[in-house]
Amino acid sequence: MTDGGMTKDAIGAGALAGEGLRAFFERDAITVARDLLGCHLTVDGAGGRITETEAYFPDDEASHSFRGPTKRNGAMFGRPGNVYIYRIYGMYWCLNFVCHPGSAVLIRALEPETGIAAMMERRGTDMLTALCSGPGKLCQALGIDIEINDRLLDLPPYALTPSTPVPIVAGKRIGITRNAEAPWRFGIQGSRYLSKPFR
């Protein structure tokens, strides 16, 4: 049973689509961030198991949605299960999944499982644990950029398959200065595929 009162079996065993996708994401971002851990994400067939996430809310000063909709963050106010992609430092893309409008989950890391050769080529490394160990690295490995922003996760090139529950650790979010004490970063306990260890 998830924190939102819904079993993952009830959501469906295959890739999330249609009403199943909406039901999974139309919950608070903390619940979704926890339930995304262990889920299998692919982009054009390359991907793996999500190992680390962060939750963001409209009333959260660290969130892009805090000051309301803009041209840049419009996708964050889309339907549950919508993809919101943005760039940091003028270089690195970051992948987020929308929950309630203005709430989203940042995908920080995953454990590579499929399309590994393509990911290694994009990243320029054969170190498996370093392929997707951070939001920018993850997007580079999966070939994610603004061209596949603002579309639902049941549309190509995305596929997201639910998982059975996994052991979870929580801690402070990374790289923010506002609302920095909120323990809204989540990871699979014991995973080697994280952006940074939990302390």
UniProtKB/Swiss-Prot annotation:
CDD domains: AAG
GO molecular function: alkylbase DNA N-glycosylase activity; DNA binding
EC number: 3.2.2.-
Coiled coil stretches, renumbered: none
Transmembrane segments: none
GO BP: any one term: base-excision repair
UniProt-listed NCBIfam families: 3mg, PRK00802.1-3
Gene3D superfamilies hit by this protein: Methylpurine-DNA glycosylase (MPG) (3.10.300.10)
The family this protein is said to belong to: Belongs to the DNA glycosylase MPG family.
Organism annotation: Rhizobium etli (strain ATCC 51251 / DSM 11541 / JCM 21823 / NBRC 15573 / CFN 42)
Keywords: DNA damage, DNA repair, Hydrolase
Protein name per its UniProtKB record: Putative 3-methyladenine DNA glycosylase
